[in-house]
Amino acid sequence: MEAEFSGRYLLTLAAMTVAGFILITGVVAIVNPFGLIRFAPTIPGINTAKVARNESDRLIKRYDPITLRPKTIIIGTSRVKFAFDPAKVGSVFAPAYNAGIDALSISEGQQLLEGYLHDGIPIEHVFFELFLFQFFHSWPGRQQEAPHGRDGAITDFLATSFSGSAVRAAIETVRASLASNVVVTRENGFRPIARPHNGVGFVPPQWLASAKTQSEPSSDDEISSPKQPLSLLRDESFRDLEKIVEFCRAHNIDLRFFVSPLHPVFAHTQGKVLLHEWLRRISVLPRVISFLTTEQFRDYELTRPKLYYSDYSHVSFAAADLMIEDLMAYPNQRYGHVLNPNTLPRIIAEWDDQLSAWEQLNPDFVQGFKAAMRSGK
């Protein structure tokens, strides 16, 4: 009798466990908080605002393109993620996917691209962003790099369907969907929040924290460039770029690099020598379009609204639209300039002139930076 009761108890416990597993998995599948289940229904007020996608790019953007099957991939940092609308990519380049990820390193971009081809995505064109901070040994906000591949697919499935984090994500999705005013990452990888800045509080106090480790004052009138710029740039990043070039060449992929606008706040605090060395090293890459000296992007004074910048780090939708237009039109671009060893001296000279003009427009910022460097704060 006791054995029979024990058997029934274990059977009931097993049935409840299975039922609980099915219930949790079913609820998570219906809510679909990560947006990975393409056939899941869209229910207003329940699963329209998938906020979990916003913070899960390194997972989600491995798998999204498998079902979307884009012809063009835009790879880059949060500057791409927030501003580059794949819907603006047309003609032979459509459809496109925004593979922008916060603080994306060059090696992560390489792994993403190789993983996409491994998964059979029919990529024909790649627009690859080159941002100065991607080449530093350390970058605030950079996460541990996670290789792309099929080896972790089962683990990823469990993490997004049957786990505590998946349940929490489902609850957050329902809560945000009820509010219906949350900006979320779309299925094509685009999270549209890079609006023009209104000029108020444009440069946050935190700029000093990252700036003081890159430059030191040499006198009251001059901020010196880093003494050893090469030590600040990761050689591995440049080697990874060479691998990307060879990979795309081997698979007949049209690869186009682009250097998006760099706000003078960054340029001034990093120093000209470092910037020159970085430009020199990327100028040997094929098909590099530089937007550093584009006249339209000089709308960066600290004292008035910014059409082409959403903050001191990110560009706006308007800037991204112009860059997309040029990337598709290459080599007949209207706004950017081809960067190669022949054009390098001219681009550097123009950029230095622009930076000097900006410093004259913003003397308070320049003097404040010098004072901060002298005090070591």
Where do the language-model regions lie?
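N-terminal Lys/Arg-rich, disordered targeting/topogenic segments
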Residues: 1-9
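Hydrophobic membrane-insertion alpha-helices, especially the h-region
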Residues: 12-32
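Alpha-helical transmembrane signal-anchor/signal-peptide segments
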Residues: 31-56
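Short extracytoplasmic
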Residues: 47-74
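Membrane-embedded segments
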Residues: 68-161
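Secreted/periplasmic serine-hydrolase-like ester/acetyl group-modifying domain
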Residues: 130, 139, 143-251, 335, ...
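Flexible, glycine-rich surface segments
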Residues: 213-304
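C-terminal regions of proteins
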Residues: 269-377
